[in-house]
Amino acid sequence: MSTRFTERGVPLVESQSLQLIQSASRLNDVITKYLSQRLVEKSYTSITPSLLSFLSILECGVNYGSEIARNLGVTRQMVAKTVKELCRLGYLEQINSAGKQKEIHFTETGEYLMSDARQLLSEVDEILFKNLDRKPKQIISELNMIAYAVNEKQHT
């Protein structure tokens, strides 16, 4: 393990974990930006990388703002604002249900948007995995094992 130093001489230990996190983040940013650009070309209006990332965590059926907020680690107000924008754009709709909560559903346009995004991702698969020795499932499994190990360490 090597160590670099800041201008003031503070040691900075090299970290493969940091490199992994930065590479994964960069890959996520590049793919999400590519998808949003391609979807805009397909006439899906105003679909930004951040809105696309938000949509990607939703279930195909019923969603609730509180569950979305919990999964994303954000406030319900932030979720409500984003859902309102996606409803305005025609990708989501809110339906009154029992109690205060509203059900959040994809509209037909929203379902087509997600279908087209998945199709574009399958095309990205060709680029990502064509020159690799290992199978995508193996890489995904290894990344999940890393995430599990870090999560376990957090709770011990």
What are these regions (language model features)?
Residues 16, 47-51, 109, 135:
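N-terminal positioning helix adjacent to the helix-turn-helix/winged-helix DNA-binding module
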Residues 33-78:
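N-terminal helix-turn-helix DNA-binding core of bacterial DNA-binding proteins
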Residues 20, 24-27, 31-38, 72, ...:
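Alpha-helical linker/hinge and terminal dimerization helices associated
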Residues 1-12, 135-156:
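C-terminal regulatory/oligomerization modules of transcriptional regulators
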Residues 1-45:
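N-terminal leader segment of winged-helix/HTH proteins
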Residues 5-7, 84-141:
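Charged, amphipathic alpha-helical coiled-coil/dimerization segments
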